[in-house]
Amino acid sequence: MKQLLFFFLLLLSFSHAKYMDNHSCNECHEKIYEEFQSSAHSHSYFTNTLHQQIADVVSKEKYSCATCHMPMADNIDELLSGEARPNKSNKTHTDGVSCFFCHTIAYVKRAHKFNINTKAKQAKGYKPTLYGRLAKPDDSDKHSSVSNPVYAKKVCMGCHSHKINDNNTTVFRAMDKKQDSVSCINCHMPEVSGGAEKMDKRARGQHASHKFLGIHDVEFRKTGMDINITVEDKKLNVMLKNKMAHPLIVQPARAKFLKIEISRTEKVIWKNYEKEPNEDKQGYFAYSYTQDKKEVIIPAHATANIVNNVEAESSKVLSYDTPSLQKGDSIRVGLYVQLAKSDCAKVIELDDSDLTKPQLMKEVVFIQD
């Protein structure tokens, strides 16, 4: 309770300190800076093509995504109101979800539409205070350091919990109301070798990875789902077990789907779709949206949605009618992801083929005895 009271007093009595850009962290936190540079958090409106195009379709005046995608903007109110636009010459705009922002969150306020990160105000004329989870953190000549209980359980909830639009339609949902950030940190920020600082004064020997591992990491994306195959006469059952603390599908632009093929002597004799993966309704996982009963791709103003999903830490069995199997027949089941589902091309230009190209998450093969 004393710690929480201390942080509230900070908010009431201090004003903003000078912004420390991402690169300034490199001097002491070289390894963490290197990890961060490869993460999604390092990307901004200017380097994330998909995000930029979607944001511009929603509005070419207001940058309503700034709250989470440009949180340290020194003119964030003007960006949200449409009085200003993202500026490539402004470091607080190009730093993405910056180191300084993530380490100056005082607390997270729960709200219906989206949770709110409240930034700590800093003592004017003094070096800034940065927060984290480490016990007895070290100060430096650039900043003071304080262990903040928010970073143990709540820090991810500000941006990664949920988003509901003005029509009370869910845009995305990764966490339920009872969840905290512990499982997020354990999976996406595992402990890796090396201290948090280059000097490692306290010989900690480990630090939380700042790669923020996710769908872009080939090895990491194999770990979230188990695929089990069983065959009964002319019935193929595929059980998907979601081991993650969030649903299989979170982002509205993304699609994940099953590609299933049965082969006999190297010839495909059955598959779950012919041309497009969404032909298999049960094996295609994505959000779809309507606005006043008309299909829309971008959900900013949607009035309803439908989602086929596998909920957090749950299983789903998909059943298919297939030909009778013979000895030696193989069943190949692959779970794929499209970072931008094909429908996105209806409303934005997707020159980056990697966004729509299906990428394998996990594959299993069953051979009939």
Predicted regions and their residues:
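Hydrophobic alpha-helical membrane context
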Residues: 14-15, 254
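Sequence context of c-type cytochrome heme-c attachment sites
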Residues: 16-178
